[in-house]
Amino acid sequence: MSTASSSSSQTPHSAPQRMRRSTAGSPPAAAGSGTGPAGSCAPAAGAGRLLQPIRATVPYQLLRGSQHSPTRPAAAATAAAALGSLSGPGGARGPSPSSPTPPPAAAPAEQAPRAKGRPRRSPESRRRSSSPERRSPGSPVCRVDRPKSQHIRTSSTIRRTSSLDTITGPYLTGQWPRDPHVHYPSCMRDKATQTPSCWAEEGAEKRSHQRSASWGSADQLKEIAKLRQQLQRSKQSSRHSKEKDRQSPLHGNHITISHTQAIGSRSVPMPLSNISVPKSSVSRVPCNVEGISPELEKVFIKENNGKEEVSKPLDIPDGRRAPLPAHYRSSSTRSIDTQTPSVQERSSSCSSHSPCVSPFCPPESQDGSPCSTEDLLYDRDKDSGSSSPLPKYASSPKPNNSYMFKREPPEGCERVKVFEEMASRQPISAPLFSCPDKNKVNFIPTGSAFCPVKLLGPLLPASDLMLKNSPNSGQSSALATLTVEQLSSRVSFTSLSDDTSTADSLEPSAQQPSQQQQLLQDLQVEEHVSTQNYVMI
C-alpha cells in the first residue's frame, strides 16, 4: 500500500485506476491505512458525528465498481450489497462528499465484526464518505473522491443541456434548437407563425372582464345601479320638459327654466340611450360624469343666476324645442348638420333638457337622435308632397318625377342607338324576300296578284317555274309540285270522263292559255277542295 500511495502521489491522472485498486484492497489493510495522517485528524470531529443528517452517500457507481473487484472478500461484498439495499431508507449515516466534518474512524478490530454481523457500514465506505480536504494527499481514498464528484456533475450537466454543435448547426440554418431533455412550460414557437403575446393577453382580459360582468362583482353592481338611476331620472326630466314645451306659449324662455330645474334637482344627467358606446366602455361612463358634473354645475348655475342672455345663445343650435317657422319648411334650405326633425313623437328617445355634456358626443350631433337622417328624408317627402321612396337629390329628367333608369356610357365611348338602327334596316331588307328574279321571269303587272306570264318553254315546267317564283313566298316547293300534279290530274280526269282514247286524252294538254289561266284561278280559290281531290285520286 505504501508503493500504491507513492505511485498515486506521483501520477494524479490515474485516479480511476486507483479507485478500483482501493476497492479491491482487503479490510484490515484498508483499516490499517487509517492509522496514518488521515486517522490522526479523524477523532477531532467525533463530537459532530451525532449532529449530521441522515443521507444516502453511497452512489450506485461505487456499488457497481465493487462487484467487479476480483480480490475483495465475500463478506465485504455482501455487506456493501446490503448497504446499497438499505441506503434508501437511511441505512448509510454519513455526510456528503463535500461536507467538512467527517465521522471518526473506528478501530479495525471493531469494524470487522460489525461489517460481518450487522450490515450497517463497512470501513471502506465510512472512510470513503469522508471529505478529501481532511485526508492526506498521499492516501489513495483521497484520489478516489475527486474524480467521482466530477463525474457525477458532468453527467448531470450533459443531461440538462445540449452540446454546442447541436445548438449552432440548426441555429445557423434558421431553425430553433429543440432539446428533448429540457421541459419547457409551453410548446416551441416560431416567430414567423406566432402572433404577439399581447394579443393573447388582451383576449384573456376581455374574457375575464365579460365573465366578471356576467357573474357581477360589488363594484359593477354599484355601477349598474347608478346607470339605472340616471336613466330613470333622464326619462323623467325629458317627460317634464316635453309637457312644459307643449303647455308653454313662449318659444325661448322655458328652455332656461327647464335647465335650472334639472340642475337644481341634481347635476346634469346624461342620457346614455342616445350615445353609441360599446358595452366594454359603459362601465367607465359614471366616472366621467362624476368628474365633469361639478364643473358644469358651477358654470351653468353661475350663468343662469347672473345672466340669462348668456345661456340663450348656447341653446340656439339645439332646435328641438321651438316649432320651426313656415319659411324654414322648404326642403331646399335644409341640411343634416343644421336642422333637426320637427315631429316630437318621432324623436321621443332624444334628450330635451341640456346640451350634450359627455365627451363621447361632438357638438355637431347635439340632436342626439339615432334616426335624424331618416326624419329629414321623411320631412322632405312630407313637405314636397311626393310619395316616391327615392330621395329628392336624385336626378329626375321629367317634371312628373318619373325616373328614367339609363346608364351613361363610360368616358371615351359613344352612345349607340340600337332600336333606331334596327327600325331603319327593316324596310330595306323586307322586299328582298318577296321580289322574284327578273332574269328568270318576265311579267307585266296589271294590279292583280296573279299576272299573265310569257311561257318560254312547254306547259308543265313553265307553270312549275311560275308557281315557285310567285309573290306568295309562304308557299313551299312541295305545294308548287302539288298544284302541278293536280293540274295534270284534272286534265286526265276530264279526258277519262269523256271516254275517249288515250291519244285523244293528250290533246287537252295543248289547249290555249286562257284555259290555263282559268285552271290556275280555280286552283288558287279552291285550295282545300283540290287537296281533297288529290287525296281521293
From Swiss-Prot:
Stored InterPro entries: Glcci1/FAM117
Region Disordered, annotated ranges: 1-45, 62-254, 309-407, 495-520
A cellular-component GO term for this protein: cytoplasm
Keywords, alphabetical: Coiled coil, Phosphoprotein
Compositional bias segments (type: Polar residues): 329-346
Phosphothreonine modified-residue sites: T101, T166, T168, T256, T333, T340
Annotated tissue distribution: Predominantly expressed in thymus and testis, especially in CD4+CD8+ cells and at specific stages of spermatogenesis.
Top-level taxon: Eukaryota
Residue ranges of coiled coil: 217-244
Compositional bias ranges of the Basic and acidic residues kind: 121-136, 178-192, 309-321
Modified residues (Phosphoserine): 69, 96, 98-99, 162-163, 214, 248, 293, 335, 384, 388, 396, 402, 470
UniProt entry tagged with the keyword Coiled coil: yes
Biased composition (Low complexity): 69-86, 152-168, 347-359
Compositional bias ranges of the Pro residues kind: 97-106
PANTHER family named among the record's database cross-references: AGAP011572-PA, GLUCOCORTICOID-INDUCED TRANSCRIPT 1 PROTEIN
Name this protein carries in UniProt: Glucocorticoid-induced transcript 1 protein
Organism ancestry: Eukaryota, Metazoa, Chordata, Craniata, Vertebrata
Gene: Glcci1
